[in-house]
Design a protein with these regions (language model features):
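Class I SAM-dependent methyltransferase Rossmann-like catalytic core
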Residues: 23-61
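Conserved class I S-adenosyl-L-methionine
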Residues: 64-73
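Conserved SAM-binding loop of SAM-dependent methyltransferases across substrates and taxa
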Residues: 74-86
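Conserved SAM/SAH-binding beta-strand->alpha-helix loop
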Residues: 97-99
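Conserved SAM-binding loop
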Residues: 104-105
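A short glycine-rich, Lys/Arg-flanked "PGG" loop and its adjoining helix->strand segment in the class I
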Residues: 151-163
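Conserved beta-strand signature within the Rossmann-like core of class I S-adenosyl-L-methionine
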Residues: 161-172
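Core SAM-dependent methyltransferase catalytic element
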Residues: 195-228
Length: 228
């Protein structure tokens, strides 16, 4: 019979204790950052694992090129992307908060972390990208920003994507965080997941593509994930 050593973590802590420490440490970091800058942070806790996996599902396993993550925070979506099979060398994390940048660099060796403003994406990533991106995956609190900022971000992201690239965004609301009127200046198609009820609070994932891009068959990976 194989025995499990429950005290093989640093300092003699059990794996369970370490998991709790990491989880609640992330919660504390988010709450602290939210109090310091609630508009930029948007949420008081990191995205849950079901929401993170639902977002990662929209990044094709067959895709190539960089995957840009906006507002990674403590890295739950980053972890889901790595578990999805995205190589660390392809990940570019754009984070505004210095403390989160330091945490991400420690937690995810091999991933590139860029401290900067995601709402000025072209300038922030100038000289960083080495080719068209496969996806831009965003955890930014878009609804905290004026509509022109959201539309400009989508246009900026589309300019970095390859032919099959996608812009993935979650929201706690049930309607698209990118307004329909944006189509007057940025031509796009959008699809939404079913609500991810196991996230607290429940959320929905939106996937945006340039209107000229190939459109996928109707399938909802996020919905399948929630049913598991």
């Amino acid at each position: 019979m194989r025995t499990h050593n429950k005290t093989n973590g640093p300092g003699g802590k059990s794996r369970i204790a370490l998991a709790f420490q990491e989880r609640f440490g992330d919660e504390a970091s988010f709450i602290k950052t939210w109090f310091e800058n609630p508009v930029a942070t948007g949420a008081v806790s990191p995205s849950g694992r079901y929401l993170s996996r639902a977002m990662a599902r929209y990044v094709s396993e067959a895709s190539t090129g960089p995957v840009i993550e906006l507002g990674p925070g403590t890295g739950p979506v980053t972890q889901a992307l790595l578990e999805r099979g995205v190589d660390p060398s392809r990940l570019i994390l754009v984070e505004f908060d210095h403390a989160f940048c330091q945490l991400l660099e420690r937690r995810f060796p091999g991933v590139r972390v860029v401290q900067g403003d995601a709402y000025n994406l072209s300038k922030t990533l100038a000289g960083v990208l080495d080719g068209p991106a496969a996806a831009v995956v965003s955890s930014l609190p878009l609804l905290n920003r004026p509509e022109p900022d959201r539309i400009a971000l989508l246009a900026d992201a589309f300019g970095m994507l390859g032919p099959d690239g996608v812009f993935v965004q979650f929201t706690y609301g049930m309607v698209s965080p990118i307004p329909r009127r944006a189509a007057q200046s940025v031509s796009y198609t959008a699809e939404a997941s079913q609500p991810v009820w196991l996230n607290l609070p429940p959320a929905r994932v939106w996937c945006y593509r340039p209107a000229s891009a190939p459109q996928p068959r109707k399938a909802n990976a996020a919905q399948r994930l929630v049913r598991n």
